Curated annotation (Swiss-Prot):
The gene is smpB. It comes from Orientia tsutsugamushi (strain Ikeda). It comes from the Bacteria. Required for rescue of stalled ribosomes mediated by trans-translation. Binds to transfer-messenger RNA (tmRNA), required for stable association of tmRNA with ribosomes. tmRNA and SmpB together mimic tRNA shape, replacing the anticodon stem-loop with SmpB. tmRNA is encoded by the ssrA gene; the 2 termini fold to resemble tRNA(Ala) and it encodes a 'tag peptide', a short internal open reading frame. During trans-translation Ala-aminoacylated tmRNA acts like a tRNA, entering the A-site of stalled ribosomes, displacing the stalled mRNA. The keyword Cytoplasm applies. PANTHER family: SSRA-BINDING PROTEIN, TMRNA-BINDING COMPONENT OF TRANS-TRANSLATION TAGGING COMPLEX. NCBIfam families: PRK05422.1 (NF003843), smpB (TIGR00086). This is SsrA-binding protein.
Amino acid sequence: MENYCKIVAQNRKAKFNYFIEDKMEAGIVLQGSELKSIRSGKVSIEDSYAAESSNEIFLYNSYIGEYKQANRFNHVPRRVRKLLLHRKEIQKIIGKLSVQGCTLVALSIYFNSKNKVKVELGLAKGKKQYDKRYAIKEQEWKKQQARIMRNKF
């Protein structure tokens, strides 16, 4: 992400459910009413992921709410959206996705400094249940340390 960016939606569960190995930025093909809905914050990318289809990358299962003023020309809220990447980036992603257990997860949607909508993607591997438990224990220990230090001083 560059100097200025306004984050519209984040996938907070992604960091809990996956090990994020690599991050990348991609543009997204939108309709007019989708852009207006994103500006008003009616977006959810909780369970969204990206996958390759015919040498292109698409974003699946992302929700962009309907824009009320668009009337009959409105968009479908859960449609498949094409991501804009260079050919070399697509080939690199396809090569990394061929590794077993790797997934491309949407981490956030934001407006960059040029006011364009961008999607931050993360190349991820799924966490096991014991990894999640360990992460929870670590977070609780850090909170407890902060409480102890706060009470000391």
